[in-house]
Curated annotation (Swiss-Prot):
The lineage of its organism: Bacteria, Pseudomonadati, Pseudomonadota, Gammaproteobacteria, Vibrionales. Keywords: ATP-binding, Kinase, Nucleotide biosynthesis, Nucleotide-binding, Transferase. It is an enzyme of class 2 (transferase). One of its GO terms (cellular component) is cytosol. It catalyses: dTMP + ATP = dTDP + ADP. This is Thymidylate kinase. ATP binds at G10, L11, E12, G13, A14, G15, K16, S17. Its EC number is 2.7.4.9. Phosphorylation of dTMP to form dTDP in both de novo and salvage pathways of dTTP synthesis. Belongs to the thymidylate kinase family.
Length: 209
């Protein structure tokens, strides 16, 4: 079986970390051990420095929306070229915490950047590279933010108003619905039901590979 790139997407508080572990466990059950785990933004020394700027900003200078967007893509291509593509070439599966869909949703939907700009930037930076499977953990923004606040202090993105996250969710759904490479999981259910739905959908996908 050819190595695949699987990405978990979703709003804050959607349960991505739990879902990632469930994906890793499901892969192991199919004999796929020790996948490369990545996160965005971040995942390489340079990309982690960019992550810090994106997440926390700078006390003496505001980070503009365009600078944020370009930092995200700079961090992304560092990760893709230096970690993800080499791992796939070596036959290792990759499980990612966020990828390009997050930028399309947060910056395109939430920040309001033009769709054509977002698509052109994606195509310029990534070309035709994309995940083999994206698992989108869908959750109502209000519930998701309640969960996120329960984890502790929020970063600069998590502090955005709820309308930002409603716009981001709408774009996530727009990108996910009727997309054969995306599985949508209702993350607002109980953990037991989320786990069951995710396991069933992922096993069905793996059996077809």
């Amino acid at each position: 079986m050819t190595a695949k790139f699987i990405v978990i997407e979703g709003l804050e508080g959607a349960g991505k970390s739990t879902a990632i572990q469930q994906v890793i466990d499901a892969l192991a059950a199919h004999g796929i051990e020790n996948p490369e785990s990545t996160r965005e933004p971040g995942g390489t020394p340079l990309a982690e420095q960019m992550r810090a700027l994106i997440k926390e900003g700078h006390p003496d200078e505001p980070l503009t929306d365009m600078a944020e967007l370009l930092l995200l893509y700079a961090a992304r291509i560092q990760l893709v070229d230096n970690i993800i593509k080499p791992a796939l070439a070596e036959g290792r599966w990759v499980v990612g915490d966020r990828h390009d869909m997050s930028s399309q949703a947060y910056q395109g939907g939430g920040r309001g950047f033009d769709k054509a700009l977002m698509e052109n930037l994606r195509d310029t930076v990534l070309g035709d590279f994309c995940p083999d499977l994206t698992i989108y953990m869908d959750i109502d923004p209000i519930l998701g933010l309640e969960r996120a606040r329960g984890r502790g202090e929020l970063d600069r993105i998590e502090k955005m108003n709820v309308d930002f996250f409603h716009r981001a969710r709408a774009r996530f759904l727009e990108l996910s619905e009727n997309n054969p490479k995306v599985i949508i999981i209702d993350a607002g259910q109980s953990l037991e039901n989320v786990t069951s739905d995710l396991k069933q959908a992922l096993n069905h996908w793996l059996e077809k590979q």
